[in-house]
Amino acid sequence: MARMQESADLLKCSFCGKSQKQVKKLIAGGGVYICDECIELCNEIIEEELGAAQAEADEEKEMRLPRPSEISAFLDKYVIGQDQAKRVLSVAVYNHYKRIKAEEAAGLEGRRKKAQDEEVEISKSNILMLGPTGSGKTYLAQTLARLLDVPFAIADATSLTEAGYVGEDVENILLKLLQAADFDVERAQHGIIYVDEVDKISRKSENPSITRDVSGEGVQQALLKILEGTVAAIPPQGGRKHPNQEFIQLDTTNILFIVAGAFAGLDKVISERVGKKGVGFGAKLETKDEKESVDFFSQVRPEDLVKFGLIPEFIGRLPVVATVDNLDRESLVKVLVEPKNSLVKQYQRLFSMDGAELHFEDEALEAIAELALERKTGARGLRAIMEELLVPIMYDLPDREDIASVHITQDCVTDGGEPEFVYSDEAKESA
């Protein structure tokens, strides 16, 4: 009995030397032993080293800011055309985050000293995007945020009203960004906010309003501070502010605002200024195609936007102007097939989950694009057309194991014809 006890005492941890009696568990393997305490210590060391390596990798990733050419190339994978807008956006976004990184690297004291010595302080450059509905404005902004891995929020300017009136306060825009950042204030302060339909908050006339314009000029005035940079008090639950409510303080200085709208009618304002509009018997009459071929938005000036209904202070806080063009039929066909996550690829993936292939004739794609042009919905309307076309097929497909592939023809799009089905070999043999 004494010998057995002695042999038990001989079993020791090969790392710390403690006997089997001194530890809770001793694990054997290949002539060596390790106790539970040493296992726990090893785990702590590994976790600490992995954590440090991960933190270093995260810091390196955070420091890596893509160049304008890389940003534009990334946008090319997802957005068709709009080359000029991509270049403007790429440079603006690059400069915005380059400014932030430089300031963070210098620190507050260094930044003050630099401002005193060099008298150069780089101001924030928010972006104004002009272009028709369905031309890719929102998608460009979303894709930028995805590349930069920053929080992104979309707000509709038409739902906003001046403080004290029924509707949303402008601070609710910031709440959406906080929610997108999981209420991480530091991360939210480097995010992107996209304000759509800003043309709908233009004031009713070019002259300053005597009466209150709570959904137009009033909203523009309310947006001024957060566009320029201020510490805003955000109610965590949204809604109106109450005196006894706790607020989250959010600095908007480094938030990039992309403000966009279709600006229907702005082309007329620009054409009057540039003298394209003739008067009298000698005036040249332009056809509809000729009018559309003139790219008026690229010639926009601040005075045109003032005449349209934006206040000068608002325009001054949006120094970068990017214009997007109407998509023609050829561009819409490319939108359907070329981007990394194009609609055709998405529906082909859905069909493959039910064991069938999906193919489109070139003529069918052109007919879909033509339909979007007729509806004046641009790229945004393509999905609705695809749904109308494919829902009846997708309804029956899960019950039809005999279908190997589906071919969409022009007749399917234009006249509601039946698609062409190719059946599996097993189905043919059984038939």
From Swiss-Prot:
Residues 1-54 form the ClpX-type ZB domain. Signal peptide: none annotated. CDD domains: RecA-like_ClpX. GO terms for cellular component: HslUV protease complex. ATP binds at residues 132-139. One of its GO terms (molecular function) is protein dimerization activity. Keywords: ATP-binding, Chaperone, Metal-binding, Nucleotide-binding, Zinc. PROSITE patterns: CLPX_ZB. Transmembrane segments: none annotated. One of its GO terms (biological process) is cell division. Zn(2+) binds at residues 13, 16, 35, 38. InterPro entries: AAA+_ATPase, ATP-dep_Clp_protease_ClpX, ATPase_AAA_core, Clp_ATPase_C, Clp_protease_ATP-bd_su_ClpX, ClpX_bact, P-loop_NTPase, Znf_CppX_C4. Belongs to the ClpX chaperone family. PANTHER family: ATP-DEPENDENT CLP PROTEASE ATP-BINDING SUBUNIT CLPX-LIKE, MITOCHONDRIAL (PTHR48102:SF7), ATP-DEPENDENT CLP PROTEASE ATP-BINDING SUBUNIT CLPX-LIKE, MITOCHONDRIAL-RELATED (PTHR48102). ATP-dependent specificity component of the Clp protease. It directs the protease to specific substrates. Can perform chaperone functions in the absence of ClpP. HAMAP family: ClpX. Component of the ClpX-ClpP complex. Forms a hexameric ring that, in the presence of ATP, binds to fourteen ClpP subunits assembled into a disk-like structure with a central cavity, resembling the structure of eukaryotic proteasomes. This is ATP-dependent Clp protease ATP-binding subunit ClpX. It comes from Corynebacterium aurimucosum (strain ATCC 700975 / DSM 44827 / CIP 107346 / CN-1) (Corynebacterium nigricans). The lineage of its organism: Bacteria, Bacillati, Actinomycetota, Actinomycetes, Mycobacteriales.
